[in-house]
Swiss-Prot record:
This is 1-aminocyclopropane-1-carboxylate deaminase. GO terms for molecular function: 1-aminocyclopropane-1-carboxylate deaminase activity; D-cysteine desulfhydrase activity; pyridoxal phosphate binding. One of its GO terms (biological process) is 1-aminocyclopropane-1-carboxylate metabolic process. The gene is acdS. Its EC number is 3.5.99.7. The modification N6-(pyridoxal phosphate)lysine is found at K51. It catalyses: 1-aminocyclopropane-1-carboxylate + H2O = 2-oxobutanoate + NH4(+). The active site is at S78 (nucleophile). PANTHER family: 1-AMINOCYCLOPROPANE-1-CARBOXYLATE DEAMINASE-RELATED. Belongs to the ACC deaminase/D-cysteine desulfhydrase family. Keywords: Hydrolase, Pyridoxal phosphate. The keyword Glycoprotein does not apply. Pfam families: PALP.
């Protein structure tokens, strides 16, 4: 497997830290040892996050093609679009963001705070569109690309989550390689990796990266899309494409893709009671914040798996914290009392 042959434009600080979640582990019985890899602390560009790691492999193509405008899409509180806006500002490029109404939730300030507020401050052309949630290609995004061309610009198309893109899985192949280096320093290997999944390329990259040492099925995706069949198909397809691209040397099978569907409800972007309990518990045990859309759901999943005895005693579990905390501001009413 060879990731080095792909050009990478550095947007992150370097390897992200691995932090023991000692108090949370003890609170949950002390039989499973929890750690977090802090992708939420990976960059100085508008709080960074998992999409910033992915964008490192897209930006060389942007520059090689002479593009002047990054065009991306997400929900109103999209972390993806905030990270694309930050990278565009960093590179001196224009940015057009399509922000669709993906979440069936209303808050007095939902479209004026958090991620979308930061994108506006970063100078992006933010376009609100009423269309609902989907993880496929969108007409509104195609129209935004065409509008840039019509104005004489040269757009570069970045799909939701950087996912359905030929290079979208590479960043998290690199994540797995980085974990292996850190495991050598720590003197032990992680038995499981827990990660949130929606558009698919984060888990897909991990599956490929950890397949290199036989741990593909130890990557446990926690679905937050509430459309698990679509998410599972996308993870599998992107993983297969990425495996071929990096020369993994074997096919990715359905058995390699583990996606837990229990924690996504009631629907995308809406937290359930377990999500909210997990957000508060992690915050109060570790001082680590998670969000109601993504990381709160994957944290809920990991906590419940520990409580249910689904990890063997003595297991070391690595929680991939992908970022997303700015979205908390969009849910101010839910958290009005903390």
């Amino acid at each position: 497997m060879n990731l080095q042959r792909f050009p990478r434009y550095p947007l992150t600080f370097g390897p992200t830290p691995i932090q023991p979640l000692a108090r949370l582990s003890k609170h949950l019985g002390g039989k499973v040892h929890l750690y977090a890899k802090r992708e939420d602390c990976n960059s100085g560009l508008a709080f960074g996050g998992n999409k910033t790691r992915k964008l490192e492999y897209l930006i060389p193509e942007v520059l090689a093609q002479g593009c002047d405008t990054l065009v991306s899409i997400g929900g109103i509180q999209s972390n993806q679009t905030r990270q694309v806006a930050a990278v565009a500002a960093h590179l001196g490029m224009k940015c057009v963001l399509v922000q669709e109404n993906w979440v069936n939730y209303s808050d007095a300030v939902y479209d004026r705070v958090g991620n979308i507020q930061m994108s506006r401050i970063l100078g992006a052309d933010v376009r609100l569109v009423p269309d609902g949630f989907d993880i496929g290609f969108r007409k509104s995004w195609e129209e935004a690309l065409e509008s840039v061309r019509a104005a004489g610009g040269k757009p570069y198309a970045i799909p939701a989550g950087c996912s359905d893109h030929p290079l979208g899985g590479l960043g998290f192949v690199g994540f797995a390689e980085e974990v292996r280096q850190q495991e050598a320093e720590l003197g032990f290997k992680f038995d499981y990796v827990v990660v949130c999944s929606v558009t698919g390329s984060t888990q897909a990259g991990m599956v490929v990266g950890f397949a290199a040492d036989g741990r593909a099925d130890r990557v446990i995706g926690i679905d937050a899309s509430a459309k698990p069949a679509q998410t599972r198909e996308q993870i599998t397809r992107i993983a297969r494409q990425t495996a071929e691209k990096v020369g993994l040397g074997r096919d990715i099978t359905s058995e390699d893709v583990v996606l837990d569907e229990r924690f996504a409800g009631p629907e995308y972007g809406l937290p359930n009671d377990g999500t909210l309990e997990a957000i508060r518990l992690c915050a109060r045990m570790e001082g680590v914040l998670t969000d109601p859309v993504y990381e709160g759901k994957s944290m809920h999943g990991m906590i419940e798996m520990v409580r249910n005895g689904e990890f063997p005693e003595g297991s070391r579990v690595l929680y991939a914290h992908l970022g997303g905390v700015p979205a908390l501001n969009g849910y101010s009413f839910i958290f009005r009392n903390g």
